[in-house]
């Protein structure tokens, strides 16, 4: 399992995960990344999303229609910046991940998890077994 100590985070990773920051749109690692695999919490290594649920939303951040396991996601009311939104945090590391909106693809449930690349790590499909995520391979068998 991939894990990262909070002391090893770069400036943007720390800003996003620990200070509830947001990275710039269209200038982050995974906004336009569609390789087959999973996305895990940058700190805890817990699986959060698969490429099967990732979609192009034109918002500039990685977007997913659902999480792998709802028990790994915490949703909180966010009233910052004069808006009312739903913040998404990781259960295990309590890291800020991004926000969830109800403007996602209707055929996939209507949700759009808008996630900061700085809060997640991509694990390629062909490395799942080797890195301890082999139990997630069935998520790709349709």
UniProtKB/Swiss-Prot annotation:
Keyword Oxidoreductase carried by entry: yes
Catalytic-site annotation from UniProt: 114
Gene3D superfamilies: Peptide methionine sulfoxide reductase
Any one GO molecular-function label of the UniProt entry: peptide-methionine (R)-S-oxide reductase activity
PROSITE patterns linked to this entry: MSRB (PS51790)
Reaction equation(s) it catalyzes: L-methionyl-[protein] + [thioredoxin]-disulfide + H2O = L-methionyl-(R)-S-oxide-[protein] + [thioredoxin]-dithiol
Single GO biological process annotation from the record: response to oxidative stress
Domain MsrB span(s) in chain numbering: 2-125
TM spans (from-to): none
Pfam short name (any one): SelR
Tagged with keyword Oxidoreductase: yes
Any Gene Ontology CC annotation: cytoplasm
Swiss-Prot/TrEMBL keywords: Oxidoreductase
EC number, as in UniProt: 1.8.4.12
Family assignment from sequence similarity: Belongs to the MsrB Met sulfoxide reductase family.
PANTHER family (alphabetical): METHIONINE SULFOXIDE REDUCTASE (PTHR10173), PEPTIDE METHIONINE SULFOXIDE REDUCTASE MSRA_MSRB (PTHR10173:SF59)
NCBIfam families, A to Z: peptide-methionine (R)-S-oxide reductase MsrB (TIGR00357)
The protein's name: Peptide methionine sulfoxide reductase MsrB
Species annotation: Staphylococcus haemolyticus (strain JCSC1435)
Gene designation: msrB
């Amino acid at each position: 399992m991939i894990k990262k100590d909070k002391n090893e985070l770069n400036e943007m990773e720390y800003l996003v995960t620990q200070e509830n920051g947001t990275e710039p749109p269209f200038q982050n690692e995974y906004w336009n990344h569609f390789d087959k695999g999973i996305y895990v919490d940058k700190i805890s290594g817990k699986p959060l999303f698969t490429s099967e649920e990732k979609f192009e939303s034109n918002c500039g951040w990685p977007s997913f229609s659902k999480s792998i396991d709802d028990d790994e996601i915490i949703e909180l009311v966010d009233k910052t910046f004069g808006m009312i939104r739903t913040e998404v945090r990781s259960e295990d590391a309590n890291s800020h991940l991004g926000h969830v909106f109800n403007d996602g693809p209707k055929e996939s449930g209507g949700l759009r998890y808008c996630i900061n690349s700085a809060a997640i790590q991509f694990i390629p499909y062909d490395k799942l077994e080797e890195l301890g995520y082999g139990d997630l391979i069935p998520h790709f068998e349709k």
